[in-house]
Amino acid sequence: MQLEIQVALNFIISYLYNKLPRRRVNIFGEELERLLKQKYEGHWYPEKPYKGSGFRCIHVGEKVDPVIEQASKESGLDIDDVRGNLPQDLSVWIDPFEVSYQIGEKGPVKVLYVDDSNENGCELDKEIKNSFNPEAQVFMPISDPASSVSSSPSPPFGHSAAVSPTFMPRSTQPLTFTTATFAATKFGSTKMKNSGRSSKVARTSPISLGLNVNVNDLLKQKAISSSMHSLYGLGLGSQQQPQPQPQQPPSQPPPPPPPPQQQQQHQQQQQQQQQQQQQPQQQTSALSPNAKEFIFPNMQGQGSSTNGMFPGDSPLNLSPLQYSNAFNVFAAYGGLNEKSFVDGLNFSLNNIQYSNQQFQPVMAN
């Protein structure tokens, strides 16, 4: 009788776990077991298992069995909560060697426990043996008596009997990861990484887009432009400096020079131009060798366009330019006397030091 009562209790309280306070549900089971033992005293017939089956039946429906009501009061549970969590129209038959139940008036009768030694039990299907509550999926039956933690005692009979199923809450297994699976997850999360990130276009630098900008070339061009502006300012200054002074013409115009002297001046100019053309074109320069495309303004009065070209490899020799400008001035004023013109301007070529003269570079806005 103890074994059959324990099977029926496990089936009933399986509906109450996780819905009502667990401690009170356990007390409800203990009180119900005690009350059922008292009720079945003198009404247990192993020789005739089905005798008194209606008296031993536990019914929960519109009318609740008095044993269920008494156990609810002793455990502190509300009878409405117990009836609301149990199946509607539940009937449990506790008979010797067999425990069965029915849900609903027209529902099928299912067997929870049956003994192998019973002649009627041998005719039943083996799948019915040691069955448990199919509605309560959170409980697992333990068929091994050695590993059973149930408080159900051993069968009181000498022959072998089926062990009552013990129901235990199903514990959630922790997530386990291998090295490969954990590497594919986010740290601190069990969600997999989003593979859509790899489809995003990465930021590209200007070099990868074809905009190859060389900083050294920019610095060289900036230095060349500043030097060109300074040289251009020097050329203009050398041309504009002697111009304000000749505005004060002498009181008496000088007589025209004789023809032999004019011819001598033309010969000197031609010799000077030949010397300039014979000078080597490739010399060391402080400018960048890539600055060959810059053209200086024509600083000579009667020079070709090639004389205005300043080679990148030639040195910054300003002496030929300055002296050529001086001779061009004489060529423009061919009718003036050289001595009186120089004395009027107070212009001395020996006093000017071109190598030591410091110039202020002119920066263009």
From Swiss-Prot:
Annotated region (Required for interaction with CPEB3), positions in chain: 161-220
Q: Does the keyword Cytoplasm apply?
A: yes
Locate the compositionally biased regions of type Low complexity.
144-160, 262-283
Cellular localisation: Cytoplasm; Nucleus
What are the UniProt keywords, alphabetically? Answer: Cytoplasm, Nucleus, Phosphoprotein
Bias (Pro residues): 243-261
> GO annotations under biological process?
negative regulation of BMP signaling pathway; negative regulation of cell population proliferation; negative regulation of nuclear-transcribed mRNA poly(A) tail shortening; negative regulation of osteoblast differentiation; negative regulation of translation; positive regulation of nuclear-transcribed mRNA catabolic process, deadenylation-dependent decay; positive regulation of nuclear-transcribed mRNA poly(A) tail shortening; regulation of gene expression
Provide the residue span(s) of the region labelled Disordered. Answer: 144-171, 233-287
**Short sequence motif named Bipartite nuclear localization signal, residue ranges:** 22-39
Please list the GO terms describing molecular function. Answer: receptor tyrosine kinase binding; SMAD binding; transcription corepressor activity
Query: Which superkingdom?
Result: Eukaryota
Q: Annotated region Important for nuclear localization: where? A: 82-92
One Gene Ontology term, aspect cellular component: cytoplasm
Phosphothreonine, modified sites: T204
Q: What is the protein's quaternary organization?
A: Interacts with ERBB2. Interacts with CNOT7. Interacts with CPEB3 (via C-terminal RNA-binding region); recruits CNOT7 to CPEB3 to form a ternary complex required for mRNA deadenylation and decay. Interacts with CNOT8. Interacts with CPEB4.
Provide the function of this protein.
Anti-proliferative protein; the function is mediated by association with deadenylase subunits of the CCR4-NOT complex. Mediates CPEB3-accelerated mRNA deadenylation by binding to CPEB3 and recruiting CNOT7 which leads to target mRNA deadenylation and decay.
By sequence similarity, the record places it as follows: Belongs to the BTG family.
> Which protein, by its recorded name, is this?
Protein Tob1
Protein source organism:
Rattus norvegicus
